[in-house]
């Protein structure tokens, strides 16, 4: 069995890790960084860019750059580039492909299996979408695990004794809080809560709005209507937020942000940490509710918690740290890297599943209650939130009308009392029920949640034994045909990426060959005949012309001819130098031989002079 990698597929950054020699190791990407921006872009020429290279060109190519796609996982959102629409699963798969390729380059072997993390508060559709993204990227997703749980694994791998810990995970786009009990290799989640639409992106948006509103007041222009200006604001907001984690004031300087009839306009303002905290105070305060909810569900008080772990880049914001300290009455633990802990935990779980690590048991929970719609549009829960998974529960229902021969099972996930206020996971029909007065038929509905948190539902008429089983595939999930099509397209992109890399290598080799040829010609000087120099110069020119075009075979062919021409000259000079016997008859050879002899004589004479 090959290596199983652990992937933290984040909203703004992603990270990949693997177990090596019993220790989890973060895998650096091709650019040498330990995290990769979760950004995908398409150039006007149709080339696909992923990661840092995509993020760098966002300002000049905002319409074709996709960021924070994770916020749309499990929805029917689509990204339109030219005439093609991409689902969140496809864009996420492109990021996963990049992480997979970086892992393969690091490990020196093919990678086909992974554990991928998701926010604890992700619903079934979002989890299924993440699994589909893995498949499209060419990965068998062995397990989907919750990000806070993964972070707890990273923290608790080498810890002894029993501890109750709280993981406060505030990333780029999602917020989770989980309470766990760890000890003797068992990691048991007691409760989880969160908000799938709260994170660092929202902090950035507050700065963007503050800048744009002030600019509009002063100049009457709304920069949010200009895609390129808006992208510059986004970049500046993110930089300012990061700087204010360590500084108390930062300067935002954006020259030539736009122009009107009176000339170019600029932004040059200072943002203090106090003002930034005022802008985001309600967002940070909104994390308090889920923290209290998780504590209540776990039946614990803040004083019962031994350690508080801060995970996700947004927990570097001082106001966030102060808020957590205020709620919990203790300093948060800062002994783990908030950007890497989740990927490290995923790598540990990957090693557990592959048998590389033993004596670790992970007991996670379902974040939201599951049930069905019953008479009057009521949501009837079958599995309560924070139930340990995997789990299976059944409940018996009956018909609502006389002689009803079929029932529609409307499967939902959420906490609200009315069905319409919860998330629909899917619908299916159990038919063939014998006509009978209402209340007589006995229909058993069974919910099964696997270790990935993915739901399977079945309904059975106990009178006839007739049953209907489904794995939830809501309207936002992909069909098998769509997944296969996307897998094939992903392979094409992979092939394009491979060809692009090969093209760059061939071009670099050709450039290097020209440099070496010109340098060697200069070094050899008169040892080369004029005819040889002319031939080499001609071949150099041919390589240069080929490099101006896009025909890779032409570049390879021209490079090969230049190499052969040089090999011919080098061989002649080498043989001539080695086989020289003084009385050569060929004038060119004799001339070359004399030069060669003179060089050696000069060297010896210098040494003799030094000795005198």
Curated annotation (Swiss-Prot):
Q: What is this protein identified as?
A: Chaperone protein DnaK
Positions of post-translational Phosphothreonine modification? 174
- Conditions for induction: By stress conditions e.g. heat shock.
UniProt biased composition (Polar residues): 586-598
NCBIfam families (UniProt xref): PRK00290.1, prok_dnaK
| Keywords linked to the UniProt accession | ATP-binding, Chaperone, Nucleotide-binding, Phosphoprotein, Stress response
Organism (species)? Thermoanaerobacter sp. (strain X514)
GO MF terms here are:
ATP binding; ATP-dependent protein folding chaperone; unfolded protein binding
**InterPro entries, sorted:** ATPase_NBD, Chaperone_DnaK, Heat_shock_70_CS, HSP70_C_sf, HSP70_peptide-bd_sf, Hsp_70_fam
Where do the record's region annotations for Disordered lie? 578-612
Question: PANTHER family, from UniProt?
Answer: HEAT SHOCK PROTEIN 70KDA (PTHR19375)
Q: Which domain of life is it from?
A: Bacteria
Sum up the protein's function in the record's words: Acts as a chaperone.
Q: Name one Pfam family in it.
A: HSP70
Please report which protein family the annotation says this sequence is part of.
Belongs to the heat shock protein 70 family.
